[in-house]
Amino acid sequence: MLLEQLKQAAEQRHALALTRRRRIAHTACAPHQAVGEEGTESESLLTFCSNDYLGLANHPQVIAALVEGAQRYGAGSGASHLVSGHSLAHAQLEAELARWFAPHIAQARTLYFCTGYMANMAVLTALGAAGATLFCESLNHASLIDGARLARADVQRYPHCDTDALQALLAASTSARKLIVTDSVFSMDGNVAPLRRLLELAERHDAWIVVDDAHGFGVLGEQGHGVLEALGLSSERLIYIGTLGKAAGVAGAFVAAHATIIEHLVNTARPYIYTTAAPPAVAHALLASLAIIEGDEGRQRRAQLARCIATLREGLAQLAASAGWTLGDSQTAVQPLIVGDNGAALALSAALEADGIRVGAIRPPTVPEGTARLRITLSAAHTEADVRRLLEALSAAVAQREAA
């Protein structure tokens, strides 16, 4: 019975052009990457779908630090953080990140997690106790949605970036613990949440803000410290979650918050307590990555990323209008080209791959029905010539479609 049910579900996904499949990367994460299917030869594709925004995943200094960390600490941690798996490298990483966020969060401490998904789940389940209310942005990442579902708190959703609707919900709430939960840079749209206004509402209504800055950390701000630095925000009411497997180029995530909140997470957050700690070598590599992000090279890489974004948007503006597509209102590394139909998005992605370019087609349920899209992501490792090559391939795909 179970297998028949699952086969029927698979057939339904296929009929709706919603089947997902994995590809195999044969080389390091980089703009030009060898990609193949299981049992087939790989081919080199110009890739615009990774989240390696600063091009650090293949940086020689980060790789060298990873090797050095493995030689010093071994391949694995051997236990959870609260048993014997918390290494000097983990402690040094948390201390360095706490320094970064001291200007923005009173009595800042940080806590390192194996993944961003775990960090989001941990914060919402540990703080979303019975009697609390989570006020969740409608386009939050799946990990925030799942964390809210597992929390014992009441959950109320507000429309995308609609601070008036949120204010009404906050004003009507009698909850003793209120948490506003939002992405900073929305992962499928690339736009930035109105965090300054959200913080004003939090202070007015005695609420706290949980900010998932997965796509802003390392990229936004003069030093790459993320959205709080970029907007000049500071408050003890901020609970910041940053990802270390995207712009930082390695793996994991962290929570930055008031020391009392971090201590609560250490003692009550099940995704932190009941899992083996990440390899210390990963934390050691991240220290090298953070030094690059904060230094002159990081500034240069962010400037290169900004040039690539400007080149792409200039070219896509005309192309999207002529093709009947919608270019999302994004100034970040995430550039959504909304096609609408699932099949059309898949066909466009396939046409690009036939031309040697890899861009993922994003479909429901990841995005709302009728908004299937190409999610184009840029990296500082891309050149402006790479971006122009993508624009040429998109133009050719449009011409081919019109000729048919």
UniProtKB/Swiss-Prot annotation:
InterPro entries: Aminotransferase_I/II_large (IPR004839), AON_synthase_class-II (IPR050087), AONS_Archaea/Proteobacteria (IPR004723), AONS_Proteobacteria (IPR022834), PyrdxlP-dep_Trfase (IPR015424), PyrdxlP-dep_Trfase_major (IPR015421), PyrdxlP-dep_Trfase_small (IPR015422)
Pathway annotation: Cofactor biosynthesis; biotin biosynthesis
UniProt-annotated binding residues for pyridoxal 5'-phosphate: 116-117, 187, 215, 243
One GO biological process term: biotin biosynthetic process
Keywords: Biotin biosynthesis, Pyridoxal phosphate, Transferase
Family as reported in the entry's similarity comment: Belongs to the class-II pyridoxal-phosphate-dependent aminotransferase family. BioF subfamily.
Function field: Catalyzes the decarboxylative condensation of pimeloyl-[acyl-carrier protein] and L-alanine to produce 8-amino-7-oxononanoate (AON), [acyl-carrier protein], and carbon dioxide.
PANTHER family per the UniProt record, alphabetical: 8-AMINO-7-OXONONANOATE SYNTHASE, CLASS II AMINOTRANSFERASE/8-AMINO-7-OXONONANOATE SYNTHASE
Subunit annotation: Homodimer.
Name of this protein: 8-amino-7-oxononanoate synthase
Species of provenance: Cupriavidus taiwanensis (strain DSM 17343 / BCRC 17206 / CCUG 44338 / CIP 107171 / LMG 19424 / R1) (Ralstonia taiwanensis (strain LMG 19424))
Gene that encodes the chain: bioF
